[in-house]
Curated annotation (Swiss-Prot):
Family: Belongs to the purine/pyrimidine phosphoribosyltransferase family.
PROSITE patterns in the cross-refs: PUR_PYR_PR_TRANSFER
Catalytic activity: AMP + diphosphate = 5-phospho-alpha-D-ribose 1-diphosphate + adenine
Keyword Glycosyltransferase appears in the UniProt entry: yes
Species per Swiss-Prot/TrEMBL record: Arthrobacter sp. (strain FB24)
Keywords, in A-Z order: Cytoplasm, Glycosyltransferase, Purine salvage, Transferase
EC number: 2.4.2.7
InterPro entries tied to this protein: Ade_phspho_trans, PRibTrfase_dom, PRTase-like, UPRTase/APRTase
Subcellular location, record wording: Cytoplasm
GO annotation, cellular component aspect: cytoplasm
Known role: Catalyzes a salvage reaction resulting in the formation of AMP, that is energically less costly than de novo synthesis.
Subunit structure of this chain's protein: Homodimer.
Protein name: Adenine phosphoribosyltransferase
Length: 185
């Protein structure tokens, strides 16, 4: 069987088209007037998941020592990417979910704030990490994740997402970081 190019399936479908074709559109979720893009059908399709992971890590190959996933769907991507690149996986969790010594970072939500945490001993200072998540919206969550690693002395090699909601300008929260998004809406 032929190997596919990064970002394409074996049928040579560009990864953005593949994601768009599998992504489910759910009107009025989580509240009326919102059109939710559900990526779980992409993750449920083995060939699509492989294409997504390959396309996310390809631009950063050899530039990271571990892959971090942001709770919760980022865990799926990070675990697959870490396995594919023979690196470790790091979890960035919501507050109160990690049992050992943590560092915390607050970030703004539409109505309030939230907190992310990271075990301080998971990556030594000087390490390099690739941060993955499913969606880049306002950039609050991914910006907080990047700040956590930087505060631990870990270099953020890049940030990768499956889908970017361009109108929300999330990249502005990631200024100074390389961002890879596979589908921009």
């Amino acid at each position: 069987m032929n190997q596919s190019e990064p970002g394409q399936t074996r049928r040579s479908v560009p990864v953005d088209q593949l994601i768009n074709s599998l992504c489910a559109t759910v009107p009025d979720y989580p509240k009326p007037g919102i059109i939710f893009k559900d990526l779980t059908p992409v993750f449920a399709n083995g060939a699509a998941l492989r294409a997504v992971v390959d396309a996310l890590v390809e631009p950063f190959k050899g530039q990271f020592d571990a892959v971090a996933g942001v709770e919760a769907r980022g865990f799926l991507l990070a675990a697959a990417a870490a396995y594919a690149t023979d690196t470790g996986v790091i979890t960035v969790r919501k507050a109160g979910k990690l049992p050992r010594k943590v560092i915390s970072e607050d970030y703004a939500l539409e109505y309030g704030t939230a907190t992310l945490e990271l075990h301080t001993a998971d990556l030594p200072a000087g390490s390099r990490v690739l941060i993955l998540d499913d969606v880049l919206a306002t950039g609050g969550t991914l910006g907080a994740a990047a700040r956590l690693f930087e505060r631990c002395g870990v270099h953020v090699a890049g940030v990768g997402v499956v889908m970017e909601l361009g109108e929300l300008r999330g990249r502005s929260a990631l200024t100074g970081h390389r961002v890879r998004s596979l589908l921009r809406l």
